[in-house]
A protein has these predicted regions:
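Non-catalytic accessory regions of SAM-dependent methyltransferases
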Residues: 1-35, 39-42, 47-50
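Conserved AdoMet
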Residues: 32-108
């Protein structure tokens, strides 16, 4: 079976299960994940034969998607604010509409940073993947560095495995964010300039 044949069959199966979604897009994403090839490579070399090992992997991935499992959970990753983030079933999948929250928080932060405070603190409650905290850190770190302002971004979550996941996302994106296990403010000290959730 070639890339082209698998894409057509998978897209048809996905469209039958959920006609409102674009089965072709999901099929292509699964094929990229299973083969490690880019979209361009797959489409340019669509007559490439799929070996047995990859075909078995594709069958398992497609079965999960046909059962309604979100693509992000299948891949274990979702991009948010141009940051690749690991996700798990213990976290919500970062959504594009959450970027509106990040934009608003950035607007408020930039206004407050005009006053050149020596220290600026942000708290993300129920951080999950760390998406909001990491997006804010990615934007504000360079600004604070230029202005000689100490930036502290802290994310808290109740579940220890979620805190580990958020920390791995910080490391993956080389961002300085502290993640703590806490029930809301329980293990957090001090005051914050911005609190998001």
């Amino acid at each position: 079976m070639t890339y082209q044949q698998w894409l057509a069959d998978a897209a048809q199966a996905l469209n039958q299960v959920n006609p409102t979604e674009n089965g072709k897009v999901d099929a292509l994403v699964l094929l990229q994940h299973a083969t490690g090839k880019s979209r361009t490579q797959i489409l340019a070399f669509d007559e490439t034969e799929i070996d047995e090992k990859v075909r078995l992997k594709l069958t398992a991935l497609l079965d999960r998607r046909l059962k309604g499992e979100p693509i992000a959970y299948i891949l274990g990753e979702k991009e948010f604010w141009s940051l690749p983030l690991n996700v798990s079933e213990g976290t919500l999948i970062p959504r594009p509409d959450t970027e509106i929250l990040v934009e608003k928080a950035l607007q408020i932060a930039l206004e407050k940073l005009e006053e050149n405070p020596p220290h600026f603190r942000i708290l993300d409650l129920g951080t999950g993947t760390g998406a909001i905290a990491l997006a804010l850190a990615s934007e504000l770190s360079p600004i604070c560095q230029k202005k000689n302002i100490q930036l502290d971004v802290i994310g808290v979550d109740l579940m220890p495995e979620v805190v580990k996941l958020a920390q791995s996302n910080a490391e993956k994106n080389q961002l300085k964010v502290q993640f703590l296990q806490s029930r809301w403010f329980e293990n957090v000290e001090g005051q914050f300039d911005i609190i998001v959730s």
